[in-house]
Amino acid sequence: MESPHSILKKVFGYDSFRPGQEEIVSRLLAGQDVLAVMPTGAGKSICYQVPALLLPGITIVVSPLVSLMKDQVGALVQAGVAAAFLNNSLTDNQKALMLRRAREGWYKIIYVAPERLEMPGFQRFAQEWEISMVTVDEAHCISQWGQDFRPSYLRIKAFVDSLPKRPVVGAFTATATAHVREDIRTHLELHTPYEVTTSFDRPNLYFATRRALPSEKPKVLLDLVLRERDNAGIIYCSTTRQVDETTRLLQSRGIRAAAYHAKLDADTRRQNQDDFLYDRVQIMVATNAFGMGIDKPNVRFVIHYNMPKDLESYYQEAGRAGRDGEPARCTLLYSGTDVRTIRFFIDKEMEADNGLPADVKAEAARKAEERLKYMTFYSTTPRCLRGYLLSYFGEAAPQKCENCSNCLLAAQAAEQVEEQAAQARQRAAASAKRLASASRRRADEDALSEADEKLLAALYALRKRLAAKQKLPAYMVFNDSTLRQMALKKPLSVEELLNIPGVGEKKAARYGQEFLGTIEDMVSSR
């Protein structure tokens, strides 16, 4: 009989769970509802994907964005999991085919938008089949206290109640204050849930803040981007105009950049997002419309060109860097103009004719102002930035982390901070071992030799060819950390390859011979 550990190894290629994952999996398998708050990159999806493959029926994953569904399902299919998504990106014929296959038992995991739960065709399907688990991803969207409130999330409970047999319910989010957690419990009506908040600490991330006048920001931004060379990155701007101007600035300097915001048509947004995911462009310049659920693991830097509206948004967006556990850099540029822009948007929401009572809108504006206050404090505080973030999310925080701009400034003159970034990244790599098992982190002795670097380059090239042939993002073949481990360990058999973190049985069967062949050729030619 399969166990959670055997599924983790066989399907996903990992020997052990990360902190917090195994207990969540066990509780869901035992039929207990779960409310899990885990930072971006902590492995939330494993927590519901593993039990989904062990429970008898189908798991429905409620997800807010088409891009998130496509990304998650693509990765699952590559790992050999029978998964599908149902949303408006499909034609009517494709939707009908997907539902027919679901009725025939093709799938174990189905991703849907919350609005889909109310549609008669899907409701009929849900009545006919055993739904073992309903997973609510990005669960903070259910709360008016949250930064991404979506009224459609409030109707998830009605769908669960309508099922012939109540499934176990798992709610997952990356950022949730006490108010948001209470809303999640109440609006989903979780039954005596197991609640867990794993550490928000991301030791591999270097945090920096820089005050810059609007006229100074273009030069500061270019300096930061040029230091990153060919690394993948995301630049967040507060307005569509700023996104377009910044994209043109980068492109004028020969930097491969693309834009993403709501005023672009759907086809352009989709093309630009794919170009970023498939490594055809280096940098995505975007409003906060981009990124929720994007699982590109090798983003090495995130720059906020403008201050976000709150720390929840900032930490979620910054957390899209370094999801592979490797060192990454998160920089916030801010000025007084940013605060005025955010207040303009708050006032605009107050004046909007959205059908909400005046007292409700006034309370929402008050909450937004409160969150903005803490965001402003973060931008200007002289204390440890990591400590400030962890304290805000209710976690014990160190007085200094030695891996943020403020901690470096405490010991060095301001003009030396950027020169110390490389050393900060090395410290981040070492401290990242605290976040996950050693098998998923680069140990000090794991430095690549010159020959290993050549092998790694050959593995990257092979991955790129295989991904292009299948029209997949490269990381869906194997992520960077897995290729690095191949270059270090140099497996020469399928058995040895399966010992590399991130290599499951299906991927070994699909890609193993080609990667083993490349390794053997490079090793024998030395």
Region roles according to the model:
Residues 21-24, 375, 483:
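Short alpha-helical "packing" element that flanks the helix-turn-helix/winged-helix DNA-binding module
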Residues 2-11, 15-19, 23-45, 52-55, ...:
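Helicase motor core with emphasis on the C-terminal RecA-like subdomain
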Residues 1-4, 340-341, 346-361, 367-372, ...:
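Accessory DNA-binding and partner-docking regions appended to nucleic-acid-acting proteins
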Residues 48, 317, 375, 459, ...:
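Aromatic/hydrophobic pocket-lining residues that form π-stacking "cages" and hydrophobic walls in ligand
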Residues 27, 304, 378, 485-486:
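Short alpha-helical segment immediately N-terminal to, or the first helix within
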